[in-house]
Amino acid sequence: MNIDSIVRELIGQASGITADSRSVKPGFIFVCLSEAAKGFVPDAVKAGAKFIVAGNAGGLPHVDHSQIIICPMQHDLYYKLASEFYHASQPEFVAVVTGTNGKTSVADFCRQIWCLTGHTGASMGTLGAIVGNTTLPSSTSFTTPDAVELHKTLSTLRDLQVKYLCMEASSHGMAQKRLYGVKASAAAFTNLSGDHLDYHGSMEKYWATKQKLFSEVLSCEGCAVLNADSEQYGELRELAAGRNIITYGVDTGDVKLARLERNTQGHNITVKVCGEVIYDGAFPVLGKFQISNLLCALAIVAASGSGHRDVPIDRLASPRGRMELIGDRIIIDYAHTSDALKHALTSLKWHGFPQKTVLVFGCGGDRDREKRKTMGMVASQYADVVIVTDDNPRSENPETIRKEIMLHCENAIEIPDRGDAIHYAVNFAIRNNYVLLIAGKGHETTQQIAGKSVEFNDGTAVRRCLSEMQYA
């Protein structure tokens, strides 16, 4: 029996689908996406699972054989079931953006632009699913949600009369086919640098995964939004041949800059689309790299047909935790790759902050260890004072992570507790007239330590410290 036949057989008999035994309810289909998941089959059956799907029969506990469906391509079946269960319902226009850095900002700028121009727009990704200014409840923290959560959210957005959506596509999400069944009206690419190599194994495999957005997800009638400034532009243009293509770039592209000035509050810019000036004024967002993200967002908006000529760019705001300015000298940014950290640090000088720079950062545990070296080197080269602290150590020994970073920035100050590190850095920066960058966690509201989720937010820690100092 092929996948389509199995879907037709099961979809009308099920009350829900999940790959998490803890989410099973009576009448659900429980899909074992890994061999380890078979160990939770008894829990799923006890909770009322009507069908059990597995890739093979090996290791399955004894259950009623009428409940078991064996499908060697159980991952594909899972995504197909998720799409069909929610009737492939989604907003009229869905743009999907991929790339190492910038995805969240692009999606957020798109949502802001659509809303500011009188449309019902939404974004979905690392910050959650946001409609207008309201974040929807979610059970996931993934950039690209699990297939069931994704299609459930898409269906909810449709029910809320959302017409335009821009969502992020992570490399994990692409590799695990979480976007199966999404009808992408546009696919956009930001940039490529090293990340998640612990998962993908090599830059070649990482890049190949990113390309799947254009070869497997973007519809034949869809639009490819390509970064003309990127090294990957030529390869992606060939991959997108036969589809509509909109290019963007600082110096060249259908959407490009004609003028750029910067200050400590952001930028003043002139933007052209196909040779026509569509905006001349302020862009009140910090970060030189945010210019490229804005241009990408404008290209997506142009592809959507919602209108790109009267966009109030001067009313755009930084996404939460993305070059977020607190007071006049403290910036919080999500930078968690060496490339992103370099861009964040160099942007401070580029914007004309006259002060020296204090940097607070760490690296995540159970993730690509090579980043500890490269981020340490960037910190040592571009920051005047470096404070190494804990990020999300997860199951690793935090001290080991810090030591591996400090091998490459020998003069760094080590303060294990992130709250203590921020308190020290805020006091140091204000008393010595430095500018402070706190990198790595951005908008996150928890810290993952030894299997526990501890409530913590960089911005909250900064504001508490400023309040104690009666500075703000």
Curated annotation (Swiss-Prot):
Cofactor annotation: Mg(2+)
Positions with a binding annotation for ATP: G99, T100, N101, G102, K103, T104, S105
Catalysis: reaction(s): UDP-N-acetyl-alpha-D-muramoyl-L-alanyl-D-glutamate + meso-2,6-diaminopimelate + ATP = UDP-N-acetyl-alpha-D-muramoyl-L-alanyl-gamma-D-glutamyl-meso-2,6-diaminopimelate + ADP + phosphate + H(+)
Motif (Meso-diaminopimelate recognition motif): 391-394
Compartment list: Cytoplasm
PTM comment: Carboxylation is probably crucial for Mg(2+) binding and, consequently, for the gamma-phosphate positioning of ATP.
GO BP term (any one): cell wall organization
GO molecular function terms attached to this record: ATP binding; magnesium ion binding; UDP-N-acetylmuramoylalanyl-D-glutamate-2,6-diaminopimelate ligase activity
Sites bearing N6-carboxylysine, chain numbering: K210
Catalytic activity, EC: 6.3.2.13
Sites where the protein binds meso-2,6-diaminopimelate: R367, D391, N392, P393, R394, G440, E444
One Pfam short name: Mur_ligase_C
Protein family according to the UniProt entry: Belongs to the MurCDEF family. MurE subfamily.
Function (record text): Catalyzes the addition of meso-diaminopimelic acid to the nucleotide precursor UDP-N-acetylmuramoyl-L-alanyl-D-glutamate (UMAG) in the biosynthesis of bacterial cell-wall peptidoglycan.
Official protein name in the record: UDP-N-acetylmuramoyl-L-alanyl-D-glutamate--2,6-diaminopimelate ligase
Organism: Anaplasma marginale (strain St. Maries)
